[in-house]
Regions:
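N-terminal juxtamembrane cytosolic/stromal segments of multi-pass membrane proteins
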Residues: 2-44
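Hydrophobic alpha-helical transmembrane segments of polytopic
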Residues: 44-54, 82-87, 121, 145-148, ...
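Terminal transmembrane helical module of multi-pass membrane proteins
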Residues: 155-216
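Membrane-interfacial segments
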Residues: 69-70, 100-105, 135-139, 210-215
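Membrane-proximal helix-loop-helix units in multi-pass membrane proteins
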Residues: 108-167
Length: 216
């Protein structure tokens, strides 16, 4: 009788843990389904890393081409071309990699959720673009990089409501860096490079390690 009780105890315990594991699996599956339906999860860590590399390449080109003897108008035009080229390359890369990831995760890329995330990201970016044009027109060149960092950070925080919450922390980092740059004159390119180059690469690596490696 004692042996039967012992066997019954171990069987019941094993059944309990099996049911517990199944319950946890069910909870995780439900959580994944809810995230797919309420958040844009096709964000790619590689896209952030490549965006950072593009920014570093653009900053390097700027330091090699622009010299103290370069005319101010030529310098501004060249910097504008570099910034727009980096933005375009990063946007195209992010779009392609996000589309490829959406095919793997089963989330529709062209969905209402995607458009909402893009809209919340684009609105601060467009506003920042208008402010940057105004700065150029009034020749307040020293705060141009600060404004770019600040509004990009705001765009990330605003878009994080519809994607991974960690995107907001990247946005906060950009906002803090832009705020510091406002009071540190003469180092605009350095702060721009740290933000758009270093922060993107660091975030992309951490994002891959925390999210994508677990999914693969």
């Amino acid at each position: 009788m004692f042996i039967l009780n012992v066997l019954f105890y171990f069987v019941s315990q094993s059944t309990f843990y099996m049911n517990k594991d199944k319950a946890l699996e069910s909870v995780n599956e439900i959580k994944e389904l809810m995230e797919k339906s309420s958040k844009f999860i096709s964000v790619s860590g590689l896209a952030a890393i490549l965006a950072g590399i593009y920014a570093l390449a653009g900053a390097y080109i700027a330091t090699q081409v622009i010299t103290p003897e370069t005319h101010l108008i030529v310098t501004l035009e060249f910097m504008a071309i570099i910034a727009l080229s980096v933005l375009a390359a990063a946007a195209v890369t992010a779009g392609i990699l996000s589309y490829c990831k959406s095919q793997k995760t089963g989330q529709s890329f062209f969905s209402r959720l995607t458009y909402r995330a893009l809209w919340n990201f684009s609105l601060p970016m467009l506003t920042g673009g208008i402010v940057c044009i105004s700065i150029l027109m009034h020749e307040y060149y020293d705060i141009l990089a600060s404004v770019m960092l600040l509004f990009y950070g705001l765009a990330l925080v605003n878009a994080s409501k519809f994607t991974y919450s960690s995107v907001a922390w990247l946005g906060y980092a950009f906002i803090c860096l832009g705020a510091v740059d406002c009071f540190w004159a003469g180092h605009s390119l350095l702060f721009w490079t740290i933000g758009f180059g270093g922060f993107h690469i660091l975030y992309g690596i951490l994002f891959y390690l925390h999210y994508e490696r677990k999914q693969s």
